[in-house]
């Protein structure tokens, strides 16, 4: 079963896992944080002590506090975190950053991690990994990708009588995430 955390139409508070389930919870890191809609929606799910594997994907800049924030959010929702991975992928906005990632070496490393996680699950090892990040988390902010005018900018008005409206979507409005429960009894 797959649950799309970007789908605001899902009644997340009605979702409940079983203790012998394994959930793979994957989110992007935007500005070193988990997108707020993912935090809100994951928080509404009843994890019921299901084991959780966390994956935070970032665009080759830094994962910063996103993985530890995901851990805290998952644990507060009742999940039991047993593994965590930060994975590099092509940047979601500037596609030239980390182009070609994950590459063959990344895939090999991820495959090795998957093998280690499978062994841990098979052994019913519920130890919590040490996950990097800071508490309190860094402040949320507007993406550095948005231009910030300063004294060197010049306003040029070509059509002063026309009203122009631009829709600026924040990174939090562009995310896609999923959580996939897997059956692995312990």
Model-derived segments and their meaning:
Residues 28, 150-153, 185:
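Generic detector of bulky aromatic hydrophobic side chains
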Residues 1-8, 12-148, 177:
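FMN-binding flavodoxin-like domain, especially the glycine-rich phosphate-binding loop
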Residues 162-180, 186:
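Iron-sulfur cluster-binding cysteine motifs and their immediate structural context
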Residues 132-160, 165-170:
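A mid-sequence, solvent-exposed acidic-amphipathic segment
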């Amino acid at each position: 079963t797959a649950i799309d955390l970007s789908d605001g139409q899902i009644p997340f508070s009605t979702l409940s896992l079983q203790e012998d389930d394994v959930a793979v919870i994957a989110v992007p890191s935007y500005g070193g944080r988990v997108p707020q809609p993912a935090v809100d929606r994951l928080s509404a799910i009843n994890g019921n002590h299901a084991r959780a594997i966390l994956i935070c994907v970032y665009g080759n800049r830094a994962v910063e506090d996103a993985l530890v924030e995901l851990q805290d959010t998952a644990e507060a929702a009742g999940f039991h975190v047993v593994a965590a991975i930060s994975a590099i992928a092509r940047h979601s906005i500037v596609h030239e950053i980390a182009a070609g990632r994950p590459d063959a070496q990344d895939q090999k490393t991820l495959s090795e991690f998957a093998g280690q996680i499978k062994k841990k699950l098979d052994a019913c090892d519920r130890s919590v990994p040490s996950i990097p990040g800071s508490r309190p988390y860094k402040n949320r902010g507007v993406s550095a990708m948005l231009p910030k005018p300063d004294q060197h900018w010049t306003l040029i008005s070509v059509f002063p009588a026309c009203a122009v409206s631009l829709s600026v979507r924040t990174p939090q409005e562009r995310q896609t995430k999923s959580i996939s429960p897997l059956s692995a009894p312990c």
